[in-house]
Amino acid sequence: MSAIYDKGTDCVYISAKELAEFISRGGDIGAKDSRGNKNGKTIVSHKLWQKKPNILDSYAFTTISEGTKITVFSYPECLHKMEKGYSIDYIYTVDYSLDIIDNGQLEVALKTAVCAGYIMCERLGLTEIEANVSFYREGSDEAREFKQVISYEDLKGNFELMIALFSPFAKIIKDKGSNVTEQLSSLRFPFEGGPREGQRDFIIDTFRAIKSRKRLVVQAPTGIGKTMASLYPALKSIGCGDADKVFYFTGKTTTALSALNAIDIMRNQIPDLRSIHISSKDKCCVSFKPGDRRRCEPKYCHRTKSYFDKINVALLDLLENYRTYTKEIIDEIAQRYEVCSYELSLELSEWCELVVCDYNYLFDLNAYLRRYFEIMPEADFIFLFDESHNLPDRAREMYSVTLQKSDFEGIKNKYPQIDEFTVACQGILSEFDTYYQLAMSEKMEINDTLCGFYINSQLSDDFILPYLDMIEACKKVFRKSLDDDEVNEIYLNLKKLRSVCEIYDKRFTTYIEAVGDEVKLRIMCLDPSFMLDACMKKGICSILFSATLTPLEYFSDVLGCEKSNTLSLKSPFPPENQCLICISNVSTRFDDRDKSATNIANIIRAMIAGKSGNYIVYFPSYSYLMQVMEIFKEKYPKIPVTAQSRSMSEKAKKEFLDSFDEKKEGTLVGFCVMGGSFSEGIDLRGERLIGAMIVGVGLPTISTELNIVKEYFDKTRENGYAYTYTYPGMNKVLQAAGRVIRSENERGVVLLVDDRFASPEYKMIIPEYWSHMKYLTNARDLLDTVTKFWKK
């Protein structure tokens, strides 16, 4: 909502269009966007009101409702002098069929004209006015017009009713503009003694980045207090008038909740600040079951029925009674009023100073929040990116898309009654036949199966045409109310393909793979940094931070922040609390794993012999994990072990973590995969984990696709192997090592096992806070070192 409060005039300002749309909306959720539903694009002929409108008094009307001063204004270009009297004209251009304009849309359009008409009548002393509303379809001559002469009395009655309904929201806007701003401007750092070492530098540099409207990339080791160090200056900047809203982006629910917890710590200073965590649509939907298609229509979900009739009541309940909006609170209110929890959270976010959500709500081509990053291009947003080491890989996948021949073979005969659908399927299958021939120009035989591949960085102008035909054919299926999960999944993938093709350039490539009769087409984004850069430009400042951004220059580059300021902080924990050792004479390369497995088992035994407690050993692959664990169990049968399995339910993951109990006597050795669920994002504090051993340098598994990425970076950065394998691998090592020592009073052992860690290449990228690492070559010296450490 674009209504604002001006402290100087002690008044809430809102346009006639905004007021009418907010108060008069009604009907169901039935959003199928480009499939032909009413929720397509709408462009009003006059300019949209921006943050500080230049309001002519002759076209504005001020009233006081329940103690709140409200000014509603309209645009001069809407008023026209006729031969007899005046008309108020609103022209809408839409991108969908005018046949599906319903009473709800017409009601909002007419109420907009009514609201503006009343203002004109008041200022010009008119007894009536003609309200004209016209709809035109973009790119065609199709038009629908609605005309109505309305008396002053009717205009006044409608206007006063809208003001009465808007009044409680106006009070909230006033409180937000006065109380919240004042609270944030005087916000103090919430902990006694002020920021800790390193945290202060983080805060100062964040303030500077916001003031100068630049980006900052921060490597802040565990214990710095990254969440508070980023949130505190960002929120205070709202109070200082430097920003409107803060977005805290993260890829994990645990870090999202940490942001809300930080607000709770400051809550006594900012009681009126509103913060929200937007969960994914799948997690919010009460009708969705994994494996099914989500159907956001009254026929399938009762919470979409009359959603827009009920939304304001639900919204007001939340705004008046809560300030921190978790998924649980939003779900409770959504259930009370029988409305969609996800849509309610999006609506509610517009009233919040802090929005916590996933990366894809900014970066994903089909999931980004259009209400902020398309409709409000001039708003002053601050972006905070937690765990930003995950962003390059997430983004690369967001801008890549895969199609398979078998998907279209499975649906080609489904709807013989829809000729366009059958023809479109056949057209795409013909394309896949061509892809097959291209792939087989580089054919080989693997396990008695004929395989081939083809790579081309160019994309012809007509490449997308058969897929666009298929998109239109899918729409015909949906228009006939034929519900088909399989077709819907293909349709969504084709929409993604269309979006990716629109940004396809030299940073993409087309990869075709044929295995037997199956053909896979993959449009690969090799370097998403340009898209990350473009999306971050939608905010005034971006702060990207993580405990593991090594090397910092590499991450600044792949995050689209090549020219940004950087900050690398030291660990706040005493180095003497960490026994950091590298066994530098063991090779864990794939070809050497059979020879090194027994040695690894003996090294584990030496590491844990110094002190009883809980340990985790991280391996580069599951097969290597199982190989070493079996040897370890055979050699040391009395030592309890637990292992990560290939696929674990949430319940199984919790049980695995619960086994690391600090009150349990004896020793437990956990066997996990590096880069998996238990090497990042878990917080085993105190005695729950006193040691971690990292086997190998974390290199991603070599693949054709990664080698394509490597070749790209060889050409563009002259360092393809490091960009594709070395640096991402080292990041996994640092993340796994970071599971040990989570607070300043903890002590623990971190052991790296691989001869490559002692090479100049790796010594150059080992972070400064690991400068105290000892290099050993045998289990006996390891045992002596850890024993002495624990005796200190």
Language-model-detected regions and their locations in the chain:
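Conserved pre-motif I regulatory segment
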Residues: 176-219
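Walker A/P-loop
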Residues: 211-233
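Signature of the SF2 helicase/ATPase Hel1-core->accessory helical subdomain module
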Residues: 230, 257, 261, 337-354, ...
